[in-house]
Swiss-Prot record:
Keywords carried by this UniProt record: Endoplasmic reticulum, Glycoprotein, Lipid metabolism, Lipid transport, Membrane, Sphingolipid metabolism, Transmembrane, Transmembrane helix, Transport
Protein name according to UniProt: Protein ARV 2
Biological processes annotated in GO: intracellular sterol transport; sphingolipid metabolic process; sterol metabolic process
Gene responsible for this protein: ARV2
Residues listed as glycosylation sites in the UniProt record: 107
Family, per entry: Belongs to the ARV1 family.
């Protein structure tokens, strides 16, 4: 079996290896033959440093995560994909519940079962529209890799949604939800740029179109549910 190649986080060029390990805890980082920089400085960084650079939307951090951490050619990637889909839908459901509770205040007249069903329908319909519109816009505007790789990229780069869990703790205003939504959009665009090597403007346009359609479908679905 051929050894899997890694990617230089500086220029995106393929490299044979990221480091040479001489003994446990003793290794040397390799340089990229193309740009002559250290291929992946994040190998020896703490997870917190990587997370901060992801929040800052550094392309180096996204290359490290998408190419050198996640092995998209692995047989286990399908298992990872299903886990990410579930986590993404759960976070989106939590977002919808936060918005609903904020807008409805203390209204508890709606049964829990009906409310849960309505939220589930809203989340599934909005995300179906998001994936469909994203795939359509990307096909028109970008050089597309495989669909599975793009889906994995979007799911991973939506990690910003985890900040929604901080809202009930610190009692943030509802506007924070929309700030998180904007961060998810820009994070998706950076990850898409890394995966497709397309212009930033095109990647932003694709993500803006997909997120806008998702927002519209979510609003329409929520309105239909409220009048039923």
């Amino acid at each position: 079996m051929a050894r899997e190649k890694k990617t230089c986080v500086e220029c995106g060029h393929k490299v044979k290896s990221l480091f040479i390990q001489y003994s446990p805890g003793n290794f040397r980082l390799m340089k990229c033959e193309n740009c002559e920089e250290v291929a992946d400085e994040y190998v020896e960084c703490e997870l917190l440093i990587i997370f901060i650079d992801l929040i800052l939307h550094k392309t180096k951090a996204y290359r490290h995560l998408l190419y050198n951490v996640v092995n998209q050619e692995s047989a286990n990637v399908q298992h990872l994909l299903w886990k990410l889909v579930l986590a993404y839908l759960l976070l989106d459901t939590y977002r919808s519940l936060l918005l609903r509770r904020t807008n409805d205040g203390s209204n508890v007249s709606m049964s829990f079962l009906f409310e849960s069903l309505e939220v589930l329908v809203n989340v599934l319909s909005a995300n179906f529209a998001f994936v469909f519109s994203f795939a359509f816009a990307a096909k028109l505007m970008l050089v597309m890799p495989r669909g599975k790789e793009i889906l994995l990229t979007i799911l991973i780069s939506s990690y910003v949604k985890i900040f929604l869990f901080a809202m009930p703790v610190w009692e943030f205003p509802v506007s924070v939800i929309f700030i998180v939504d904007m961060l998810v959009l820009t994070s998706n665009a950076v990850a898409l740029k890394v995966m497709t090597e397309s212009a930033t403007s095109r990647c932003l346009a694709v993500c803006f179109i997909a997120h806008s359609i998702r927002f519209l479908v979510d609003q329409i679905s929520g309105h239909l549910g409220s009048v039923m």
